[in-house]
């Protein structure tokens, strides 16, 4: 495993505008003035560390270098003061370049006091919320794979191959002619940590760097250096040893060593994780029996000093006085490795080989998409003669003839089962109610006439439920705001869970008309009787059983949402067949009205969300438009219009790989 530190250092310099203050009249040359000049410099260093790195309240530390020089205090006829502030900002950005298996969240210090309850999934790399699909795929490709048998075996084979190529094997290998010889091999050399020549090399490097720096140095600011030394003495007394001063340069010292418990935590964290490119080298096997070499990966978990971006601003300096001292241990380790390679030329183990195995089953993508569109348009003309029209249709013969003509065209197929049959009438192409889309605000009887089974007092079940005229509790009461005075006002009505028909009995002894579609709850005296499903529906006697219904027609769904009927089913001929179709239409419509209630008034809303799922994403789109108002129609009468459109789109795409499905 290779890892080294690279630091990017950027320096910004800027100055404020010079401020010149004059007092008195400037002297002329004939005045023979005596002039006193003075100069004063002020230095201040501020080191800023992000607060979450150190866990302290104060994230910055200031170092005041004090003033140098003095200004003359004497009085004079003319005084000129010139003031300018120079700033220099040095940004040191250390980066680790490594192929160790480091989680991306490792830039934060693990807090041992942090309880598990605050460990949210969004803080880990598996959460890819608020990412577009391309970014999600990129994350998924670099995310950790589960340890499967094939992966484990492949890694173990690679490990054995690398051991075959190692120098230790060459060293331990015995030749045939040495079989009977005594063991006289020299001791395993291995890398020596405290090599004297290596130390000399390091000091030579430092001398060369110092000479280079002296050659490139600008004019020496002796006063500032003197002040720096004084400040260093003061800091020694304060016991602040975070910086060390070499000549006129301030170096950061090494951070405190990491506590052992945190190191163990990090080691566990790292060793339980596999990356996509698992590369191992001979050095790592010497150190640990595991794939990951943790010791090189945990260097940056410093409890005090490490931050991804340390910002230091400096006032009044003539050259760079803040430099980053590279951590020695890693540099020494790299030098050791290089020197070892020079001494013992072998196969280069530093090259990262990434072998990508192609899986047998690549991926299974699940796609799910649902789109719905609902439109509702209401036009209501203001009428004068409401009461006359309302009482016009109360004779049974008019109703009956209307029904005969209205249901005649629906004999061939079940009119409203559009989702089942795939064929419908001309006005009913869509899944939703299209036959007549008026919403009845003040139920004109004339408007409600001939609309289906639920037409007696309201346009449709979902409309009346939405308006609050009728409260439906599935096996409870049907409460009506009107007809409270009737004998049936609070009667409990049963919801049928079977496909059996529910009748009122006694062959219509109360002489109600066959097609009286008014909600005559006062007339309904007889109890509810359920026919057993085994009996044929053609019973004895009674003018309400028609010949068209001589065969047994099973109903496709149990009647769930509205099992109350208008005046006890009102006959068994065409009306019953139409009743079943209207029931399925009403159920679909009631469900959709609950799912997507229509907006009222003027509205233009758009809701779009994309959420991240494990292995995929889902999008949800909803648009609602509505407008209402009043305009004059063609004949000049005022028309209240109310239009609403809703579109709903839900899409889910998910990738399932074999490992996830197997578990």
From Swiss-Prot:
Provide the Gene Ontology terms for cellular component. Answer: apical plasma membrane; basal plasma membrane; cytoplasm; cytoskeleton; hemidesmosome
Its GO biological process annotations read: embryonic morphogenesis; hemidesmosome assembly
Ranges annotated as biased composition (Basic and acidic residues): 367-380, 620-640, 649-663
For the keyword Transport, the answer is no
**Keywords, comma-separated and alphabetical:** Cell junction, Cell membrane, Cytoplasm, Cytoskeleton, Membrane
User: Polar residues composition bias: which ranges?
Assistant: 1-15, 517-526
| Tissue spec. comment | Isoform a: Expressed in the uterus, the vulva, the rectum, mechanosensory neurons and in head and tail neurons. Isoform e: Expressed in spermatheca and weakly in the vulva. Isoform f: Expressed in spermatheca and weakly in the vulva. Isoform i: Expressed in spermatheca and weakly in the vulva.
Q: Where is the stretch described as Disordered?
A: 1-78, 367-430, 517-546, 597-663
Q: Where is the composition biased (Basic residues)?
A: 381-400
Q: What happens when the gene is disrupted?
A: Embryonic lethal with failed embryonic morphogenesis. Disrupted intracellular structural integrity from the 2-fold stage of embryogenesis resulting in thickening of the epidermis, abnormal intermediate filament distribution and detachment and collapse of muscle from the cell body, particularly in the head, tail and midbody. RNAi-mediated knockdown results in developmental defects whereby 95% embryos do not undergo morphogenesis and arrest before the two-fold stage with abnormal head and tail structures and reduced motility within the eggshell.
Its assembly, as annotated, is: Interacts with vab-10 (via plankin domain).
How is this protein named in the record?
A: Protein pat-12
């Amino acid at each position: 495993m290779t890892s080294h530190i690279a630091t990017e250092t950027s320096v910004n310099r800027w100055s404020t505008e010079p401020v010149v203050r004059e007092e008195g009249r400037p002297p002329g040359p004939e005045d023979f003035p005596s002039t006193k000049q003075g100069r004063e410099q002020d230095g201040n260093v501020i080191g800023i560390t992000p607060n979450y790195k150190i866990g302290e309240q104060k994230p910055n530390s200031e170092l005041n270098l004090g003033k140098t020089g003095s200004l003359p205090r004497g009085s004079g006829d003319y005084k000129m003061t010139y003031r300018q502030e120079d700033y220099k900002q040095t940004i040191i950005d250390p980066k680790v370049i490594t192929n160790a298996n480091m989680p991306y969240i490792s830039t934060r210090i693990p807090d041992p006091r942090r309880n598990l309850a605050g460990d949210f999934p969004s803080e880990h790399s598996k959460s890819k919320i608020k990412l577009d699909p391309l970014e999600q795929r990129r994350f998924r490709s670099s995310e950790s794979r589960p340890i499967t048998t094939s992966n484990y075996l492949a890694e173990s084979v690679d490990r054995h191959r690398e051991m075959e190529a190692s120098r230790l094997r060459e060293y331990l290998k015995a030749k045939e002619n040495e079989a009977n010889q005594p063991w006289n091999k020299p001791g395993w050399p291995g890398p020596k940590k405290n090599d004297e020549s290596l130390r000399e090399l390091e000091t030579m490097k430092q001398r060369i760097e110092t000479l280079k720096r002296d050659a490139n140095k600008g004019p020496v600011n002796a006063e500032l250096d003197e002040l720096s030394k004084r400040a260093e003495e003061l800091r020694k007394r304060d016991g602040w040893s975070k910086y060390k001063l070499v000549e006129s340069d301030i170096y950061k010292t090494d951070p405190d060593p990491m506590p052992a418990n945190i190191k163990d935590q990090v080691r566990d964290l790292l060793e339980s994780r596999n990356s996509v490119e698992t590369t191992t080298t001979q050095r790592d096997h010497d150190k640990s029996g595991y794939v990951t070499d943790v010791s090189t990966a945990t260097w940056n978990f410093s409890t005090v000093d490490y931050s991804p971006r340390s910002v230091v601003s400096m006032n009044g300096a003539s050259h760079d006085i803040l430099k980053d001292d590279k951590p020695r241990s890693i540099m020494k380790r790299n030098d050791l490795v290089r020197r070892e390679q020079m001494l013992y030329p072998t196969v280069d183990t530093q090259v990262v080989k990434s072998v990508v195995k192609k899986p047998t089953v690549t991926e299974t993508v699940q796609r799910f998409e649902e789109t719905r569109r609902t439109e509702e348009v209401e036009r209501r003309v203001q009428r004068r003669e409401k009461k006359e029209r309302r009482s016009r249709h109360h004779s049974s013969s008019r109703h009956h003839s209307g029904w005969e003509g209205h249901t005649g065209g629906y004999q061939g197929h079940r009119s409203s089962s559009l989702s089942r049959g795939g064929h419908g009438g001309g006005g009913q192409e869509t899944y939703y109610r299209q036959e007549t889309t008026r919403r009845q605000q003040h139920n004109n009887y004339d408007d409600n006439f001939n609309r289906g089974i639920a037409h007696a007092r309201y346009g449709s079940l979902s409309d009346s439920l939405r308006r609050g005229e009728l409260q439906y509790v599935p096996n409870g009461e049907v409460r009506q705001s009107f007809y409270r005075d009737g004998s049936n006002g609070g009667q409990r009505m049963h919801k049928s869970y079977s496909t059996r028909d529910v009748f009122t009995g006694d062959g219509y002894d109360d002489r109600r008309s066959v097609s009286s579609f008014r909600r005559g709850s006062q007339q309904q005296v007889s109890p509810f009787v359920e026919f057993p499903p085994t009996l044929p529906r053609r019973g004895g006697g009674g003018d309400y059983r028609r010949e068209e219904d001589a065969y047994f027609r099973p109903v496709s769904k149990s009647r769930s949402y509205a099992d109350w009927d208008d005046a006890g089913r009102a006959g068994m001929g065409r009306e019953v067949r139409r009743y079943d179709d209207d029931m399925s239409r009403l159920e679909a419509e009631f469900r959709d009205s609950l799912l997507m209630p229509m907006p009222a008034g003027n509205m233009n809303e758009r809701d779009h969300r994309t959420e991240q799922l494990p292995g995929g994403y889902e999008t949800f789109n909803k648009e609602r438009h509505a407008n209402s108002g009043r305009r004059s129609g063609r004949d000049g009468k005022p028309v209240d219009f109310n239009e609403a459109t809703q579109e709903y789109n839900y899409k889910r795409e998910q990738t399932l790989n074999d490992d996830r499905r197997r578990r």
